[in-house]
Amino acid sequence: MLTILKLGGSILSDKNVPYSIKWDNLERIAMEIKNALDYYKNQNKEIKLILVHGGGAFGHPVAKKYLKIEDGKKIFINMEKGFWEIQRAMRRFNNIIIDTLQSYDIPAVSIQPSSFVVFGDKLIFDTSAIKEMLKRNLVPVIHGDIVIDDKNGYRIISGDDIVPYLANELKADLILYATDVDGVLIDNKPIKRIDKNNIYKILNYLSGSNSIDVTGGMKYKIDMIRKNKCRGFVFNGNKANNIYKALLGEVEGTEIDFSE
């Protein structure tokens, strides 16, 4: 079984405090991932795991230094230095996460998109190395990054850009979105399940003026699970044991199921 776990929201860092780390959360999440991997091993069950995280308090403040608005569009400037500096900030964040995972004996390995991802008419992402890592029971840890855009020079790709691409290319069985809310919220309450019977009602609600999409991309998350015809959860990664439960497919939150 291939599972993709996206760590997002304010789980790992505070975007309002540059270069901050929520150490208690990071340590807890590493422990829960380790416990889940041990569970599968003890049950003689196979799990292949990919972790994805965003820029957090590291990538965002640096990227802002090299962005300006011109004719209503965001463009990058001074990228002879900026590309390296954004790349370095993301690598620094990723290294902290990798080091913590490794301290719990999780075979985590870093994947830096800027070295092999190109954006043109579509995202071009060579997944051959990731496939080989998964065959060897390694845990690839991939992050949002600055990449080459063959039309516009440069582009930031987020964790939410990476997850659906990998899910489609690698045929993921389970997509997990660890956010800072309790699931897909309707009237401030998490809906238990989204499937073919209520998907359009939910999407219409999230498009309406009464909806507050606190994660900034809840519709996108739901739609990616639907398009990839798999099962997923949107849940609160700040709550103890939720990462562990999610990896076992039983977390409290919103279950989204379009598996066939």
From Swiss-Prot:
GO terms for molecular function: ATP binding; isopentenyl phosphate kinase activity; kinase activity. Substrate binds at G55, H60, G159. It comes from the Archaea. It catalyses: isopentenyl phosphate + ATP = isopentenyl diphosphate + ADP. Pfam families: AA_kinase (PF00696). Gene3D superfamilies: Acetylglutamate kinase-like. InterPro entries: AceGlu_kinase-like_sf, Asp/Glu/Uridylate_kinase, Fosfomycin_R_FomA-type, Glu/AcGlu_kinase. GO terms for cellular component: cytosol. The record marks K15 as: Transition state stabilizer. Its EC number is 2.7.4.26. Changing I86A: Confers activity with farnesyl phosphate. ATP binds at K6, L7, G8, G9, S10, G56, D180, G217, K221. Retains 38% activity when incubated at 100 degrees Celsius for 10 minutes. This is Isopentenyl phosphate kinase. It comes from Methanocaldococcus jannaschii (strain ATCC 43067 / DSM 2661 / JAL-1 / JCM 10045 / NBRC 100440).
